[in-house]
Amino acid sequence: MNSKLVQPSYTAKKEDIKREWFLIDAKDYTLGRLASRIAKILQGKHKPTYTPYIDSGDFVVVVNAEKIKLSKDKKENKIYRRYSGYPGGLKEISFEQMQSKHPERIIQLAVKGMMPKTILAKHMMKKLKVYVGPDHPHQAQNPKEIKIENI
């Protein structure tokens, strides 16, 4: 085979990565659809320079986290569990309790579940900023407001 006909595979390099900031309003979006789109942006899968083993994703700011909705009857049935590692250390909290106490954690946990189960996911999750209400402290970064339908 002639080597001039074969294109070498492109691998993103650290200096080639340009990170953008995106703003997403979570009001009236379904949790799963929103989380999958956010995970795609954090991983950089929306870019043509995507490389699986390099963190090439962008920053995402999510506002109005308390106004997220779930499909069907999950609002009454969804339970969040965590385990301390000790006997009797299983704690359960319902979606409604979580929404009243920590609404930002709902989106963070959903996105975390859709990220790859690697050490790289921990670094990608640091680029997710979730806030209750319409205000956020990232005005200086000039985040681009996007609709999740366009991703």
Curated annotation (Swiss-Prot):
Pfam families: Ribosomal_L13
Quaternary structure and interacting proteins, as annotated: Part of the 50S ribosomal subunit.
PANTHER family (alphabetical): LARGE RIBOSOMAL SUBUNIT PROTEIN UL13M, RIBOSOMAL PROTEIN L13
Role noted for this protein: This protein is one of the early assembly proteins of the 50S ribosomal subunit, although it is not seen to bind rRNA by itself. It is important during the early stages of 50S assembly.
Highest rank taxon of the organism: Bacteria
Protein name listed in UniProt: Large ribosomal subunit protein uL13
Keywords: Ribonucleoprotein, Ribosomal protein
